[in-house]
Amino acid sequence: MRIINLKTMASDEISCPSVVALGTFDGCHMAHKEVLKNAFLLARKNGTASVAYTFDSVPKAKNGDTGAIYTIEEKIKAIKKMGIDYIAIDTFDDVKNLSPEEFFFKVLRGTLNAFGASCGYNYKFGKGASAGANELKELFLENGGGSVVISDKITLGENTVSSTLIRDLIREGEVEALFSLGTNYSVYAPVVEGKHLATKMGLPTINQYIPKEKAVPKLGVYITECEIGEDVYPSVTNVGVRPTTDNNGEVNMETHIIGYRGYLYGSSIRVNFYKYLRGEKKFSSKEELFEEIEKNKEEAVKYFK
């Protein structure tokens, strides 16, 4: 898969006709994968290229929600798994004031050489989100033709699968539910210096900060897994303000990696979240905290058996 930054791409970067998958693809959940799959299949059917068109950050929603499920790097990795030929990355501010017709001719027909597209039933484009999937289909039909595949709504139980639903689940600590939606929550960040209090207690931990663009999960303790090089280790992660040992109010991640001993400061580690265990507690002593962590470790080991 080739990655194209639309700010710097050459005018003939995509020289053959293409089928463009349209969406923010934040979290790349099962509904997004349907859109990407349809673009891939239509492109293969017509012997041309498939393109995923997306943004380098999550556009601000009307409710002010901007927390991303995936960073741009995580999004690229997920889209690559779908077999797409190109991912075209744009900046939302550069196109947000284009009319639907301007977006169609400048971006789709012009830059991306699109003869077809794939989108979800609720896809919006044009200034003020003034046009939707049906208007996109009409623009193709009225301007030389081209197929537009519109994916239906996907529901699980009473819930519509969407990035908004997934962000809500993350903030409620329901990270285990994300797997049934075709996505997950993880944090990839550098290991920074902590106060070494846990290490002095015989429970070494790594400290990380959640990237500012990411949605922050419910504060508390989680069963997690750490990727270190080619190896994966079960772990227990606390997301929060460390109420027993600190009161500066700064949210961070502190992870005890089970079965690992090594120097990780300065390295970037991915922590995958699997299950919420409990909220933050203020323990009466460090010994009581130690006992609770040992209990959480046992739960983590049992979870991955």
Model-identified regions with their sequence ranges:
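A short acidic, often aromatic-flanked loop/helix-cap motif at beta-alpha or helix-coil junctions
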Residues: 9-13, 94-97, 154-159
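N-terminal catalytic cores of NTP/NDP-binding nucleotidyl/phosphoryl-transfer enzymes
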Residues: 9-71
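Short beta-strands and strand-loop turn motifs
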Residues: 21-23, 53-54, 87-91, 116-121, ...
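Glycine-rich, Lys/Arg-enriched anion-binding loops that position phosphate/diphosphate groups
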Residues: 140-238
